[in-house]
Every structure is written in C-alpha cells, then in structure tokens.
Amino acid sequence: MQIKNASNLCEYMFSNCSRTGICFYAIPSTVKVENGSPDGNGGFGIAYKSTSEDYGMLIVFSYGKAVYMKIKSITWDNWKKVKFIE
C-alpha cells in the first residue's frame, strides 16, 4: 500500500492492517517526523496486528539506511533504531 499522507504514520499503518495480518507499505519522504516517521527519509514499512488488535509491531526500513522498530502494547513506544553487527 502506498501511504500518501498520514497525520499519524503508526496509527495509519496499524489501523489498515487486518487482524493477525502482516501488511507492507511504501512510505514516501513527504511523511515527515511530525507525522510519525522515524527520520523523515521515506522507505518501506511492515505492520503486524495481533488477534485482539491491542498489540502490534511496526518495522520501517528507511531510505536513510537505517531500520526502526516500534511496538504497541497499550500505547505506542518510541521508535527504536535497530543496530546491526557488521
């Protein structure tokens, strides 16, 4: 799915994903940090929603050569930059 504009990137990705589904999104660089983007560079994202719809996870692969993760339990955590061992 292409995200054109989102006031809250996380809620947009999460709400448009079906239960126990995994959804893939293209995120343009027009989705800025103030709209929920982790770095404003665009990229692509993966969203997962639990059966109860209370829990989920978002992973964003940024065009800025970084990977970010955000988890929802009751509320959303902050974006965490994933560090890889090279």
Where do the PLM segments sit?
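Glycine-rich, flexible loop motifs
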Residues: 1-65, 71, 75, 80
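C-terminal interaction-tip segments
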Residues: 80-86
